[in-house]
Regions:
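Alpha-helix capping/termination and helix-coil
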Residues: 124-127, 157-165
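A short, acidic, amphipathic alpha-helical segment used as a generic capping/interface helix at domain edges
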Residues: 165-176
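Short, amphipathic alpha-helical "lid/cap" segments that border enzyme active or binding sites
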Residues: 8, 12-15, 174
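Acidic, Ser/Thr-rich peripheral helices and adjacent loops at domain boundaries
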Residues: 145-159
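Hydrophobic structural segments
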Residues: 6-8, 160
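A short, charged helix-loop
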Residues: 2-6, 17-20
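Short, charged, low-complexity loops and linkers
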Residues: 1-2, 30
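A charged, amphipathic alpha-helical module
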Residues: 12, 16-145
Length: 176
């Protein structure tokens, strides 16, 4: 189990082993760079949580567009994606939402299925929330910002919940 102190220590030890293996290939690990990266990723997480909230209020954003907003984060730096998402949030918050559609919540691992998104859009459905690993679920938990970056990452992993691929003996459910 990843949550108790021994689970956090085990996760950190795994990270340290990967670092040693990578350093054998060349380069060196930098605590300072990892700490800076945690700040970048936490800011990106916050922007993605905010855009998720804003998209719930804007039925004019199609399922396909929503999917693209989340998917695009895999293809650019987090800094660049954060800036684009923050600009989108600003524009959406400044405009009046379109007429309501039938709200739905989606769940799963992946929903980047153009045919499924087309059906959702054709049926006039509006995704108001998701529990999708490739969408908002990955942004729920930030790494603590402090001096020990590897412990922060291990604690982030320990604090992640409500994901079918992460063991949790209590099996909690998402609270809407």
């Amino acid at each position: 189990n990843r949550k108790p102190a021994y689970g956090v220590a085990y996760t950190k030890a795994g990270y340290e082993r990967v670092i040693r293996d990578l350093e054998k290939l060349g380069g060196t690990f930098s605590e300072e760079k990892l700490l800076a990266s945690i700040k970048v990723y936490n800011r990106h997480n916050a922007a993605m949580r905010k855009v998720d909230e804003v998209l719930a209020k804007h039925p004019e954003i199609t399922a396909a567009q929503r999917s693209d907003i989340f998917k695009s984060s895999f293809f650019m730096t987090k800094e660049e994606h954060t800036e684009l998402v923050e600009a989108l949030i600003e524009k959406l918050e400044a405009q009046t939402p379109a007429a309501e559609k039938l709200p739905i919540v989606i769940s799963g691992i992946l929903t980047d299925a153009p045919a499924l998104n087309a059906i959702l859009d054709e049926m006039g459905l509006h995704i108001v929330a998701d529990d999708v690993a490739a969408q908002s679920r990955q942004y729920r938990t930030d790494a603590p910002e402090r001096d020990d970056a590897l412990n922060a990452l291990a604690e982030k992993f320990a604090n992640m919940d409500n994901c079918s691929v992460l063991y949790n003996q209590d099996k909690p459910r998402v609270k809407w």
